[in-house]
């Protein structure tokens, strides 16, 4: 077996997705704890103590106690090497989150068991559907009062259109939470409260009918036996092929804050989640075992280190291997570059990468030449597909406090749009600058970063824009006619792509009817 294949087989690259406050950042911490990447988990809320969550390293994130940007963390677990991409869980985040899901091979979906499936989870699941990404589900917060577990699984099946197969099953909840029964191992893992920041071995009782269980939890033993008869009759068995096809999700129950159930998830991900998979290009599928190096940029982060005004491009390796000092071909620019200082990450901590394999995420120092979606190879001329831009959902006009700084404003906005923080639109018929985002917080982030990183003070004004669509047409004459008649609604985005800015959804629908030869696209390939 080649060294490359051994390394590929070991890797599991996944992201955590959830609605805000479902406990995602806590789970990230506990996953790192179980992976021996942390000695003690940071507490996520009320960060006055100075002990910040490891994955929340940007100043604004530390101030507010929420994850705004995507962090990348690598750690060993059992015989595997896990790459965890932590994505913003806050209500307001950027499409950066969506794109991160194109760089992983599986996802862990975290659900607040008291609330069930929430809006942001639905949106994120729509994105995972674009690539049929395998999903593992964790029903969190079992140490609180929760909804009926069967009802929770029914809701996942109905709302997210994915079959559920319980792997662990809770024994009561809230103050009476006793632990879980592991259906595949036929064992009960007992819960002890007060294990929030350290890992202790849980007591395990083999067999559901073991008299030790009655001694340990009393009347709850008979209750769970009765409940499981119903559960086994009403739910799906775990099917690996259906899981890998994105059609079925294994479901685990636990409490991240109580350090309970996180190791069960990790065991499942290492055992079932796919190793790095083949990736589509315009030419052919690229296999991870291919000898020649290839990778794509899915995120650009500016100024990760306030001491150095740097920008780092996050690259997912798809084939071959990265070696320090190697030559890469930047396909879009048609140039070769020598890379000797690529980085690996433990959230804000960076280390120089000497070698990295498919599934790994490395950081490349970027002086404004790299963009999201860029492909790097060892000479071949192909481009990875499926790294989209998504149409923004909210819009503001941005205005300078000092009109003489127009040049700096445009530079800052273009860089932030290349990074994926926001999108910028320049109307064809005016000198306005319109900023589009997926969530409100991104507007605040952009103004803050323009001030701190580009020394530009800007303010927002409301604007009547409902949505934006990228505009395409194979017939150049019809496109030109459309441009002439609809110039009031047309703009160029940060990459000079023609965009239709619709003041209302009614306006968009009318334009689509009036110009059937014009394609109005919600997403655009990078």
From Swiss-Prot:
Pfam family, one: EF-G_D2
Domain of life: Bacteria
InterPro entries: EF-G-like_DII, EFG_III/V, G_TR_CS, P-loop_NTPase, PrfC, RF3_C, RF3_dom_3_sf, RF3_GTP-bd
Compartment(s) of residence: Cytoplasm
UniProt: GTP binding residues: 18-25, 86-90, 140-143
Keyword Nucleotide-binding: yes
Keywords tagged on the record: Cytoplasm, GTP-binding, Nucleotide-binding, Protein biosynthesis
Database matches in SUPFAM superfamilies: EF-G C-terminal domain-like (SSF54980), P-loop containing nucleoside triphosphate hydrolases (SSF52540), Translation proteins (SSF50447)
Domain tr-type G: 9-277
MF GO annotations: GTP binding; GTPase activity; guanosine tetraphosphate binding; translation release factor activity, codon nonspecific; translation release factor activity, codon specific
BP-aspect Gene Ontology terms: regulation of translational termination
GO cellular component term, pick one: cytosol
Record-linked HAMAP family: Rel_fac_3
Role noted for this protein: Increases the formation of ribosomal termination complexes and stimulates activities of RF-1 and RF-2. It binds guanine nucleotides and has strong preference for UGA stop codons. It may interact directly with the ribosome. The stimulation of RF-1 and RF-2 is significantly reduced by GTP and GDP, but not by GMP.
NCBIfam families reported for this sequence: prfC (TIGR00503), PRK00741.1 (NF001964), small_GTP (TIGR00231)
Family statement drawn from the similarity comment of this UniProt entry: Belongs to the TRAFAC class translation factor GTPase superfamily. Classic translation factor GTPase family. PrfC subfamily.
Name assigned to this protein: Peptide chain release factor 3
Organism: Shewanella woodyi (strain ATCC 51908 / MS32)
Lineage: Bacteria, Pseudomonadati, Pseudomonadota, Gammaproteobacteria, Alteromonadales
